[in-house]
A protein has these predicted regions:
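Conserved beta-strand hairpin/beta-sheet module of binuclear metal-dependent hydrolase folds
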Residues: 1-42, 141-155
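Short aromatic-enriched loop/helix-cap "lid" or pocket-rim segments at secondary-structure transitions
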Residues: 17, 87-90, 164, 197-198
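Residue-level marker for buried hydrophobic side chains located in beta-strands
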Residues: 22-24, 53, 75, 149-151, ...
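Metallo-beta-lactamase
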Residues: 29-30, 127-197
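Active-site HxH/HxHxD metal-binding segment of metal-dependent hydrolases
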Residues: 31-32, 40-114
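A general structural detector for well-ordered alpha-helical segments in enzyme core domains, enriched
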Residues: 35-38, 64, 170-176
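Glycine-rich phosphate-binding loop signature in dinucleotide/nucleotide-binding domains
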Residues: 42-47, 123-126, 180
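Internal catalytic-core helix/loop-beta-alpha segment
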Residues: 102-135
């Protein structure tokens, strides 16, 4: 079951499996109280969240990671993301209101390879896999569910592809995603795009 959570400028998603769940992305740092209100409104409690996973480590997608992990949420990181875990540290340190927030807790990360993601998700009762889609940033990943729902973070929308003819990395990412025959594309900031009706 997928629940879209909107409490700022970034679409975040709660994906519940039969044996666990994933919170995909957060909003910017400093939005914790709005996050609490949004999950309560949707009948979700903090203890319902097994793992947090960011589609990438730009500040508007991982701002609450440190706080949520310190409160007991497990921290899932893909191996392709490790070099970029602290990308936003300097950005947050320049903001007086945010500089005291906990940094990304790299020592608590459970790092897995994309090739092992299907088995990892299956253990949570979630059917799907996680693939590297590095055209937006080197650490960007996409979560593709077997139900046809696909979560691409800040990947440039496919409808703009004609304007990016020379961007081979973007074309490669979309070819990879489309090989799964997705039904719905969930973006980090834009409305979802329905490709196939059931």
């Amino acid at each position: 079951m997928v629940t879209k959570l909107k409490y700022g400028n970034t679409n975040t998603y709660f994906i519940r499996g039969a044996k666990g769940s994933i919170l995909l992305d957060t909003d910017y740092a400093g939005t914790l109280q709005m996050f609490y209100k949004e999950i309560k409104k949707n009948g979700i409690s903090l203890k319902d969240i097994t793992y947090i996973l960011a589609t990438h480590y730009h500040p508007d997608h991982m701002g609450l990671v440190g706080e949520l992990v310190n409160m007991g949420v497990k921290f899932l990181v893909m191996d392709t993301q490790v070099p970029n875990l602290h990308f936003s540290d300097e950005i947050f340190s320049r903001d007086k209101a945010l500089r005291f927030l906990p940094p990304v807790p790299e020592d608590k990360a459970e790092v897995i390879a994309c090739k092992d993601s299907r088995a990892f998700l299956a253990a949570l009762g979630i059917d799907g896999e996680i693939v590297s889609t590095p055209s937006h940033s080197e650490d960007s990943i996409t979560l593709v569910l077997d139900s046809g729902e696909c979560f691409v973070g800040d990947l440039e929308p496919m409808e703009y592809m004609d304007g990016y003819e020379e961007n081979k990395a973007l074309q490669s990412d979309w070819e990879k995603i489309m090989s799964f025959s997705p039904r719905v594309i969930h973006y980090g900031h834009a409305p979802e795009r329905i490709l196939l009706q059931l």
